[in-house]
């Protein structure tokens, strides 16, 4: 079924590109879309606080395991799927992987929400360990630096990352049909960066539709004190919040903004160079902290960014990486390989942390962003985009909330309906290619949330907590236990189980081999690694 609302006028340039996909390209090219998931989960002890145990040996070694590793903390697990051509296959893999992990997890839960609980401060959050190899030390020291610069608490907020790309065979055909690019690679990079800019423009929509962090445990804040209103004695919240994770209590680079960094998304080259400049430019606040103390590294360097990953963004254009290659250098070398959408909260209501309806919608959303007109983003618009994201994160369900668009005020409902209505041609095409009505159904469900904010996950959470007289901790623990039961009861095929066993055994073998390969000191290793960034960076004109 389609929306009962009148659809606004849609740009002809966008429709003409959709028409190219319909008429000039093989449907198999859209069926070949590559989809991968990365889902973070905090391990929590049976007493309710962050787990202080090591990453389980039965999960493989976090340095070399490609499907199950750690993020910032030893307690923050990351489940990673390979790329699949269908979201259902990616979700099945994620379900099997989490079920497999649970079967060897002793007296601990995988936390069901993005926001953590019962933290007891920075000193109680163990930083992930990767062994004594140079690459392992680099990963650990980078995390030490994050904790030093921003505190450890915000680093254990969990999220879901959606990785998406079109098949390589798509780009020669699409480029030829457009008739305006010198190579398929130029077309690919141009259109992926168009996508990134439009995701940033409409980025507030993702926390509005899928945000699931309107409340937070008081232990998240120093001394349990916050400027946020109290929900109960153990919980802070905002009544119209959608995603405090994406708000100003979450992981943001506010300090970097003060240091003058802004990623430039107007081309692959400008994006890579803006990050390279930040990685090679000293920052006085970080210099004051010191790079090492008594011979031990505290951070990788004292520059604005230690490495590219430190720059927080809703979306990243990602390259195919060679071993020990800097991501920004790889982008300059080989262009964009896939898009990583990073703004999804963990879906507290689903045992996997994300569901099929969300992913079908996101597939269509990214394709719409790619095909829509996408002018460059100047500093004024960038400020608007940041303000819109924060406004929706903190008060997105507020009645009659207004956002800023091109210097003018626009209601969230009006803008949201315009954006979603533009997706119908894409959803109709994807449903035609794949059969059924999954994409249009997913879109209709999101339009329902624009019309009725009480249908959003953030509204459901607060209503449920109120109805149950439940703290955020009580809510999160109840759902964590419910999801644990679901995952432990799941049957995994013998073939899939054997595949996981093999990957985990291989990760331990690879780690052992890696430990014996280093032929240089850690100081020399870092110098050699960062030499590539200094060689590639251009001074700003």
Language model features with spans:
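Terminal catalytic/cofactor-binding subdomain
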Residues: 2-147, 154-160, 187-197, 201
């Amino acid at each position: 079924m389609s929306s009962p609302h009148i659809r606004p006028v849609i740009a002809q340039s966008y429709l003409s590109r959709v028409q190219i996909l319909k008429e000039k390209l093989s449907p198999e090219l859209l069926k070949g879309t590559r989809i991968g998931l990365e889902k973070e989960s905090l391990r929590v002890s049976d007493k309710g606080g962050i787990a202080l145990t090591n990453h389980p040996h039965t999960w493989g070694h976090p340095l070399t395991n490609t499907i199950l590793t750690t993020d910032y903390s030893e307690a923050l697990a990351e489940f990673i799927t390979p790329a699949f051509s269908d979201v259902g296959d990616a979700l099945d893999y994620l379900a099997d992987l989490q079920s497999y992990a649970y079967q060897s997890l002793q007296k601990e839960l995988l936390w069901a929400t993005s926001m953590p609980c019962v933290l007891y401060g920075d000193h109680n959050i163990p930083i992930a360990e990767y062994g004594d190899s140079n690459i392992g030390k680099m990963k650990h020291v980078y995390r030490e630096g994050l904790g030093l610069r921003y505190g450890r608490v915000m680093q254990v907020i969990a999220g879901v990352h959606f990785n998406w790309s079109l098949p390589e065979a798509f780009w020669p055909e699409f480029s030829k049909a457009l008739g305006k690019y010198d190579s398929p690679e130029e077309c690919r990079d141009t259109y992926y960066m168009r996508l990134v800019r439009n995701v940033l423009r409409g980025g507030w929509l993702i926390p509005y539709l899928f945000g699931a962090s309107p409340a937070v445990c008081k232990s998240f804040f120093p001394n349990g004190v916050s400027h946020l209103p109290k929900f109960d004695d153990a919980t802070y919240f905002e009544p119209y919040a959608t995603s405090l994770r994406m708000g100003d209590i979450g992981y943001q680079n506010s300090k970097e903004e003060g240091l003058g960094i802004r990623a430039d998304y107007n081309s692959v080259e400008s994006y890579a160079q803006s990050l390279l400049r930040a990685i090679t430019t000293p920052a006085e606040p970080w210099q004051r902290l010191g790079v090492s103390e008594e011979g031990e590294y505290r951070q990788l360097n004292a520059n604005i960014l230690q490495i590219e990953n430190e720059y927080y963004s809703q979306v990243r254009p990602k390259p195919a990486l060679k071993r020990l290659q800097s991501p920004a250098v790889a982008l300059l070398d080989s262009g964009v390989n896939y898009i990583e959408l990073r703004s999804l909260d963990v879906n507290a209501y689903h045992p996997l942390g994300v569901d099929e309806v969300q992913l079908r919608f996101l597939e269509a959303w990214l394709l719409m962003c790619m095909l829509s007109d996408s002018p460059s983003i100047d500093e004024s618009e960038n400020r608007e985009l940041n303000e819109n994201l924060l406004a929706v994160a903190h008060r997105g369900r507020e009645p009659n909330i207004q956002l800023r668009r091109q210097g003018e005020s626009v209601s969230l409902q009006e803008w949201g309906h315009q954006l979603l209505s533009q997706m119908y041609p894409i959803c109709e095409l994807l449903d035609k290619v794949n059969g059924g009505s999954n994409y249009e159904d997913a879109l209709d469900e999101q339009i329902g949330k624009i019309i009725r904010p009480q249908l959003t996950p953030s509204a459901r959470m607060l209503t449920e907590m109120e109805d149950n007289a439940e703290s955020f901790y009580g809510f999160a623990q109840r759902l964590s236990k419910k999801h644990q039961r679901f995952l432990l009861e799941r049957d995994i095929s013998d073939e899939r189980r054997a595949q996981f066993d093999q990957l985990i055994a291989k990760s331990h073998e690879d780690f052992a081999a890696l430990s014996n390969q280093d032929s240089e000191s850690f100081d020399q290793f870092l110098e050699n690694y960062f030499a590539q960034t200094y060689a590639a960076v251009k001074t700003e004109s």
